[in-house]
Structure formats: structure tokens, C-alpha cells
UniProtKB/Swiss-Prot annotation:
A motif (SCOOP motif) lies at residues 50-64. It is found in: Cell membrane; Secreted, Extracellular space, Apoplast. Residues 69-78 have a biased composition (Pro residues). Brassicaceae-specific phytocytokine (plant endogenous peptide released into the apoplast) perceived by MIK2 in a BAK1/SERK3 and SERK4 coreceptors-dependent manner, that modulates various physiological and antimicrobial processes including growth prevention and reactive oxygen species (ROS) response regulation. It comes from the Eukaryota. Interacts with MIK2 (via extracellular leucine-rich repeat domain); this interaction triggers the formation of complex between MIK2 and the BAK1/SERK3 and SERK4 coreceptors, and subsequent BAK1 activation by phosphorylation. This is Serine rich endogenous peptide 19. The gene is PROSCOOP19. Residues 57-78 are annotated as: Disordered. A motif (SxS motif essential for MIK2 binding) lies at residues 56-58. Keywords: Apoplast, Cell membrane, Cleavage on pair of basic residues, Membrane, Secreted, Signal. One of its GO terms (molecular function) is receptor serine/threonine kinase binding.
Amino acid sequence: MCNIVVFLLTLTLFLFSGLSNTAFARVQYEPLKPKFGARVWDQKMIKNIKIEVDGSCSRRAPGRRRPPNRPPKPCTKP
């Protein structure tokens, strides 16, 4: 019984001492060009980033409908 009390007391001590340390460990975000309206600048930069993604070569998962009577398209990816 005494071991459980000591364990819980130690656990709560570590919990509350760790909460204050996490505030110091966080890295604050700073935009590359801090200026008036920096948030708007960040949103514009995010909108300008475009990623090209090709289609998948995987087949569709089986569903409730019957599959069509045509063969699947061949994959053209290397």
C-alpha cells in the first residue's frame, strides 16, 4: 500500500514539473518576412505552392456492384 502511494506521489510530481517544461520547449513560428499582414503573406505563399500528383496504378477495391466486362487499364508508370 505504501509503495502505491509513493508511486502516485512521484508520478504527480513528474507530471506537474513536466508541464512547465513543455512551454519552454515549444518553437515559436516566425514567417520568413515579418511585416504588417504577415498572416496574409503566409496564406499567399501556401496557395502558390502546387504539387503535381499522377493517378494511381492500383485497382479499385471490390464493391457491391459487379465489375465491368472490360479489362483494367495498363499502368504506364515506371
